[in-house]
Amino acid sequence: MRAVITGGTGGIGFAIASHFGKAGYQVVLADLNQQLLQQKTAELSSQGFTADYCVLDVTDQQAIDACARRFPADILVNNAGIQHVARLEDFPPEKWALLLNVMLTGPAMLTRAMLPSMRSNNFGRVINIGSIHAVIASPFKSAYVAAKHGLLGFSKVVALENADKNFTINTICPAYVKTPLVEQQIAAQAKEHNLTEQQVIEQIMLAPMPQKAFIDVSEIAAMAAFLCQDAARHMTAQTLILDGGWTAR
């Protein structure tokens, strides 16, 4: 069983890769930085896992097609993500387009490229890493929220189109996870609001979460692994929310 994971060298992606490696899957890390890919792949291999890598820009259609030809996936994890925070009138159009390309068009085109082999083998699992912002909104994140909301609609359509096969597509939507991307947001918001980083964590990020704790990458990895199991074969087009109670408010 081969799993291709975009954003595979990052916090969430690498946690999923490690979990899948322990489960005996062949893991393919897909990301931009070749040196980091080689380092992380070697780290997986040193633990006895079967691992490889693919240098991939998810906004590059030729690169997407090449990755799918070289590593046709049984399991695809669309995890690559970026962020930009600004009021809409201050949002650079090219930055808006980039966020949509990375987090909506990229997953769509990579899923499109992987579908023929999945359908041919009568097995496919697509796992999108969404966000709490796929189901709620926050100011200054218009492009991110639009992309993540779009991912849910996209997944429902693909689920319907492939319901004749042993194929599922689902989206895991965590609240804030302590990853390098979130660390950057903490620093940026501390500067913008003249707060300490701890104040940003307590007063902004964890304030809406009744459990007052970051989601751990291991929780997301475990949920992704469950979605690949036969026990989840009828779970498709679903939005799985890990938010510490945020959406119960």
Sequence positions of predicted segments:
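Conserved glycine-rich cofactor-binding loop
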Residues: 9-10
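Substrate-binding pocket helix/loop in short-chain dehydrogenase/reductase
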Residues: 87-88, 92-100, 126, 205
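Active-site loop immediately N-terminal to the catalytic Tyr-X3-Lys motif
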Residues: 89, 136-143, 164-165, 212, ...
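Active-site helix of classical SDR
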Residues: 111, 147, 155
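C-terminal substrate-recognition "lid" of short-chain dehydrogenase/reductases
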Residues: 115, 123, 210-242, 247
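Residue(s) in the substrate-gating loop at a strand-loop-helix junction
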Residues: 131
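Short, small/polar-rich loop/turn modules that mediate ligand/substrate recognition or access, typified
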Residues: 163, 168, 235-237
